[in-house]
Amino acid sequence: MAALKLSLIQKYKLENAYTYVYSTGFLSPACPEQGARALLLTRREEAPGVYTVLVLSETGIQEIKLGEDFLDRENDPVLFSFGKGFGVIKAKKEIAYFTGDFSSPEIIPIKNGFLPFSKTLPDNARERYFQTVSDGSLIPVCFEKEVYYGLSRCFALLDFDPVKKEAKWKCFSEIEKNAFTHHDERTKDAPKIDSLKIVNHELYAFTSGESTGSVNKWGMDYYALAKISPEGKVKEKLLESEQLKAGGKKSGVNGTFTHSDYLILTPLFNNDDWKGKQKLFSLRTKEYLDIVMPRGMTKHSLYNICGELCLIALYDRGLKEIGLCKIEGIE
């Protein structure tokens, strides 16, 4: 199998203690010669544990604290990049939109239908932070409703116009489960959503199956990558696993879209066929690639790709180190 080889451009030592990489992004242009900037949504470890966006560039790390009002018990903040700026969706109702030096965001309200009895998002929808990528003004966002485990089984599209300072929800859907070979006919549970992407007016979703139990304890039932409609209709399956529980061995893979042609696949277990190593899947060629990390950084994980740039990080009971890498080539 071919492999994507990475070389280190810059390593970032963290002066503060952060919990986890919730989601990431890149600002345009994403190339070393023009001052690449990457985004990382995380959270401070010390109380009150505010969410923070780290802006990574050749000059170092700029920390943007989102404030205690983003600590919503029901809704996670959602990070999305938009050209040279980025937004953070707060509690389904507004966008904090950052441009320039990112010191003072514009607050743009989000419309949810035009009348109280014709809301696009139901009141019981809960926003989830899972990574989203878009090349246009429609931003796909993950949601959960009715039963809340911090997962996502629903999605919505956010129509965003920063020039007019307008935003509105356009749909709220689940992915049709019957389209997947190993769906569970015994339940009504919709497929879980790991990540969403819109590129060239096409909507893509990666699902990690339907299991309601702990996947870390019992494993996944299946996973799949699909091109879907805004209503959740599966238009094309690009990748679909076998029934993972049939062999009696725990297995599972999570998927994360990037600002490139590649989907990052991360196995749940170190004793599976992939030996716990991440792989890439090309949306264009439908081929797998291994990943060769820079020397001395084999324990790091890949979180995003844009052009020839890659964002990696080391997690060990907290976020320990971040690196910006360049793609050396495919070997």
Model regions: which residues?
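Short loop/turn segments that connect beta-strands within beta-propeller blades
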Residues: 57-59, 100-103, 160-164, 229-231, ...
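A short helix->beta-strand "capping" segment at the edge of beta-propeller domains
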Residues: 1-20
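Structural motif
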Residues: 47-53, 93-98, 147-157, 212-226, ...
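Loop/turn-rich, solvent-exposed surfaces of beta-rich toroidal or solenoidal domains
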Residues: 243-278
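Beta-propeller fold detector
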Residues: 7-12, 62-68, 106-114, 168-176, ...
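Repeated scaffold domains used in trafficking and secretory/extracellular systems
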Residues: 17-30, 70-83, 114-132, 181, ...
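Blade-level signature of beta-propeller repeat domains, shared across WD40, Kelch, NHL, RCC1
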Residues: 300-331
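Short beta-strand elements that form the blades of beta-propeller/WD-repeat-like
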Residues: 35-43, 79-90, 96, 137-149, ...
